[in-house]
Regions:
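Surface-exposed cleft-lining segments at the edges of enzyme active sites
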Residues: 78-84
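An acidic- and aromatic-residue-enriched active-site/binding cleft used to recognize and process polar
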Residues: 20-22, 47-49, 109-114, 139
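Short beta-strand-to-loop element that shapes/binds the nucleotide-sugar donor at the catalytic cleft/hinge
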Residues: 131-152
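Short catalytic/ligand-binding loop motif for oxyanion handling, primarily in non-cytosolic enzymes
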Residues: 51-53, 116-119, 124, 142-144
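A conditional alpha-helix N-cap/helix-loop micro-motif detector
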Residues: 23, 85-89, 181
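Catalytic core and acceptor-binding pocket of nucleotide-sugar-dependent glycosyltransferases
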Residues: 156-286
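N-terminal anchoring/stem segment of glycosyltransferases
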Residues: 1-77, 100, 152-153, 157, ...
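GT-A fold catalytic core of metal-dependent nucleotide-sugar glycosyltransferases
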Residues: 87-133
Length: 286
């Protein structure tokens, strides 16, 4: 069980992954991570020849394994109009390939529209050193709002199980798959339900074990809205934090440019904010 205590001091490796033309918000997120955790290593796996003097840019094509190529060949979600679903699934395999190619054993990874507010070594929450630490979104979904692996072998095991599951789809089934039926968040939950011992689900609502909370997506959606659809104060009752926000048990707020939540008159720090609206600049810490 996780306890409230400092993690071992590490020079953490942050790994970003993105396919396609780079929106401004990704660059803002990268710059923020450099600012918040200046002693960390930052790797950006992309296909745009991105260059930054303080960030290691890794070309996706240079790290793709044969196993990943087999998954790409199946063209999951081919007929979905939004490339997000294909790219989000592919990202899991690129992440495996980059940590294995570069021999990275410990890393933090989150979606490209996430901001962090605390250096890894200042986080009080005790991450599991043997399991994959990641944010649950709902009873049916696990999301890369924030994830941390301190054990590459464990992470490889999870990705291998995802691969074993996906390889059973025929090429026709994979191409016609719809995101509403299956996506990377639901696949992660499926693997968790089959083998929960591989995962440590991070606290996304206030708990006694920690005065820190991680945002799967819910707090960012409440404070900043969702892309192209809803303004701020959006809640989804299916999200683990969403129902508590909607019922008034949790109140997210911004204080001195840092996100916090109030629960039972106690204030909890948000380690990260998943800004679904992509309005990253609005939430950059001063």
């Amino acid at each position: 069980m996780a306890t409230k205590c400092k993690n071992e001091k590490l020079q953490m490796n942050y790994i970003y992954i993105y396919e396609g033309a780079l929106p401004k918000y990704i660059k803002n997120s990268l710059e923020n991570t450099l600012k918040i955790d200046p002693d960390a290593n930052i790797y950006f796996c992309n296909d745009q020849s991105y260059q930054h003097e303080n960030i290691t840019s890794v070309q996706i094509e240079s790290i793709i394994s044969k196993s990943t190529k087999n998954i790409l060949h199946k063209e999951f979600f081919k007929y979905e109009p939004n490339l997000l679903w294909t790219r989000s699934l592919n990202r899991i395999f690129y992440l495996r390939d980059v940590v294995n190619t570069l021999n990275i054993n410990k890393f933090v990874h989150f979606d490209a529209d996430v901001l962090i507010y605390k250096p890894f070594n200042e986080i009080n929450y005790k991450f599991s050193s043997s399991k994959f630490n990641i944010t649950p979104l709902s009873e049916k979904e696990i999301i890369f709002g924030y994830s941390c692996s301190l054990n590459r072998e464990n992470f490889n095991c999870i990705v291998n199980k995802i691969e074993e599951f996906l390889i059973e789809f025929t090429d026709n089934e994979s191409k016609n798959l719809l995101s509403k039926d299956l996506n990377e968040m639901k696949i992660l939950m499926k693997i968790y339900n089959n083998e929960p011992s591989l995962f440590n689900l991070l606290p996304v609502v206030p708990k006694e074990i920690s005065d820190e909370v991680f945002d799967p997506a819910s707090y960012g959606q409440y404070l900043g809205g969702t892309k192209d659809r809803f303004s701020k104060k959006f809640t989804d009752e299916n999200h683990l934090p969403g129902k508590m926000i909607r019922e008034g048990f949790i109140r997210p707020k911004i204080y001195n440019s840092y996100p916090k939540i109030v629960f039972n008159n106690n204030e909890f720090e948000l380690i990260n904010l998943h800004v679904h609206s992509k309005k990253i600049k609005k939430f950059l810490p001063k």
